[in-house]
């Protein structure tokens, strides 16, 4: 099929020791030549579920990207990814950019499609795990069921996604021919000529170097790259774990507005406390309910609905398998980094910015107190700035737009003044002041900072009374939040589980259960889209 189409392939002078071929039917997109593989560097079987988030974050980086290899010419490459392309074309653009900026091909593949390193302590080589952790702050995974074949014309290889949801099988013949395909028996090779049969495993890589004339196995590839720099030392020096920061004394709660009034203002109902908060606080999991949702759509309801109700969660369709977040939790991760992001293309950066690492994005009272005073505990390396998202009731409906404009301007000024963590808070909500819906505030500031080329210089932390369900947290994460502090939900739990309460559960246990339940349900929401990591989900809209 290929040779009659490309006449030059019939010329006997065209000789190659490698070939990257792709043949399949289209399952969830209409077949067209624009979507045909291979692209410049890859061919791909599967789906990149995180492509929207990857695209958005790459756009956020474009204004700040610099590379010594390309110099000023890097600006000619913008936009790095064009809208309307397939997921494979986007990944191909990303991989090509990394390779052209100086990354070895195998390293570029490891950055974009990493193994599940987060839960692999004690199971993965420490140097290799440090490699992945170092680059995790620079680039979120391109995640989804994928078997990717790649080549730069000299080296050719393949890699499997972290879940191993697409097959990859290869054989080595006696005369040193290697055939790797999505299934065995692609070409009719007699059994007597087969020296070795094997398969790609989840997150593993297989590569052939035609210059060296040999096969390079996964362990050698990754071991060599992991030892090419002192990544273990770098992560120890650069990564600050919020859990390791000394806990400050708790901040006093001086809010003059009674708890019940604030609950009413933020849309809490008796059913929310009884069927949402209590099961989470007591059992560490969301309440079990029937499938489906027969309540009216928010836009058609006669009752005022929380802003979050206007959003719906997407789910994987057609050939795109969801993930089981319970049985496959080893490949899932809620790790989040808050603060400025290193320049991805500066491969020789000797003084990259520090990273503030969170094991999961939901902050308790103690963690929020640390975040608010982070400058004291990190020697001013991290500086937080609080932005009030409330406005005067007297301003009316017009006040929302005016306040959003001022919030965006304040965010830009704060980042330019050196604040690398912005805390958006609605704590000052009162009878005279109303809170802008937090999804509106975070999305406006997130997009404005992207347009100003400043989004990668700062982190966005949400402190809100409006979020108490996992769906609420997921909406905030999808619009750019690195961390979320649901203070009113936690205050409500404190009231419910005072000493002497009938359940016998203390406040500390109830709070830990609630945060654990949010994380557990968050994984379920991500898994419905076939996404394994919070870093890939965040900012994907």
Q: Could you tell me what each predicted segment is?
A:
Residues 10-14, 37, 283, 287, ...:
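Non-catalytic terminal/interface segments that mediate subunit docking, oligomerization
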Residues 16, 21-75, 101, 115-147, ...:
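Glycine-rich phosphate/ribose-binding loops and adjacent secondary-structure elements
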Residues 1-349, 375-377:
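Conserved short alpha-helical segments that host acidic/polar catalytic motifs at enzyme active sites
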Residues 527-541:
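Charge-patterned, long linear interaction tracts outside catalytic cores
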Residues 1-8, 104, 217, 364, ...:
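Short, solvent-exposed coil/turn linker segments
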């Amino acid at each position: 099929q290929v040779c009659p189409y490309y006449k030059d392939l019939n010329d006997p002078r065209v000789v190659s020791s490698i070939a990257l071929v792709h043949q399949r039917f289209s399952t969830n997109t209409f077949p067209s030549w624009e979507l045909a593989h291979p692209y410049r560097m890859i061919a791909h079987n599967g789906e990149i579920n995180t492509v929207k988030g990857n695209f958005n974050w790459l756009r956020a980086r474009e204004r700040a990207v610099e590379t010594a290899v390309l110099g000023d010419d890097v600006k000619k490459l913008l936009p790095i990814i064009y809208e309307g392309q397939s997921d494979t074309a986007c990944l191909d653009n990303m991989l090509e950019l990394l390779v052209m900026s100086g990354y070895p091909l195998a390293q570029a593949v490891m950055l974009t499609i990493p193994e599940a390193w987060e839960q692999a302590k004690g199971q993965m080589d420490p140097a290799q795990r440090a490699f992945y952790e170092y680059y995790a702050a620079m680039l979120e995974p391109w995640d989804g069921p994928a078997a990717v074949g790649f080549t730069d014309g000299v080296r050719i290889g393949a890699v499997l996604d972290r879940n191993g949801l697409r097959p990859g099988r290869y054989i080595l013949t006696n005369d040193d021919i290697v055939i790797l395909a999505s299934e065995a028996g692609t070409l009719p090779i007699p059994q007597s000529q087969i020296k070795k049969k094997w398969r790609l495993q989840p997150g593993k890589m297989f590569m052939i170097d035609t210059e060296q004339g040999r096969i390079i196995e996964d362990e050698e590839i990754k071991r060599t790259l992991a030892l090419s720099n002192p990544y273990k030392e770098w992560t120890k020096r650069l990564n600050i774990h919020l859990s390791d920061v000394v806990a400050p004394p708790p901040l006093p709660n001086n809010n003059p507005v009674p708890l019940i009034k604030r609950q009413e203002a933020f849309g809490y109902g008796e059913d929310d406390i009884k069927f949402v908060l209590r099961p989470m606080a007591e059992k560490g999991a969301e309440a079990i309910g029937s499938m489906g949702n027969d309540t009216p759509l928010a836009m058609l309801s006669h009752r005022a609905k929380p802003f979050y109700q206007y959003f719906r969660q997407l789910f994987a369709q057609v050939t795109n398998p969801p993930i089981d977040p319970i049985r496959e939790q080893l490949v899932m991760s809620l790790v989040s980094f808050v603060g400025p992001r290193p320049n991805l293309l500066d491969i020789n950066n000797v003084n990259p910015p520090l990273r503030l690492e969170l094991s999961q994005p939901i902050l308790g009272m103690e963690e929020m107190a640390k975040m608010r005073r982070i400058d004291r505990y990190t020697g001013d390396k991290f500086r937080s700035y609080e932005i009030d998202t409330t406005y005067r009731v007297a301003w009316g409906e017009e006040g929302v737009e005016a306040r959003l404009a001022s919030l965006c301007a304040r965010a830009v000024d704060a980042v330019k003044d050196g604040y690398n963590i912005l805390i958006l808070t609605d704590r000052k909500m009162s009878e005279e002041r109303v809170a802008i819906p937090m999804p509106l505030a975070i999305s406006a500031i997130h997009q404005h900072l992207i347009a100003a080329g400043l989004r990668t210089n700062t982190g966005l932390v949400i402190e809100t009374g409006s979020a108490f369900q996992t769906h609420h947290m997921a909406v905030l994460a999808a619009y750019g939040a690195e961390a979320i502090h649901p203070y009113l939900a936690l205050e409500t739990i404190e009231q419910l589980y005072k000493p002497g309460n009938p359940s016998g559960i203390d406040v500390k246990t109830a709070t830990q259960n609630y945060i654990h339940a949010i994380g557990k349900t968050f994984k379920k929401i991500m898994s419905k889209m076939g996404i394994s990591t919070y870093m890939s989900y965040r900012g994907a809209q």
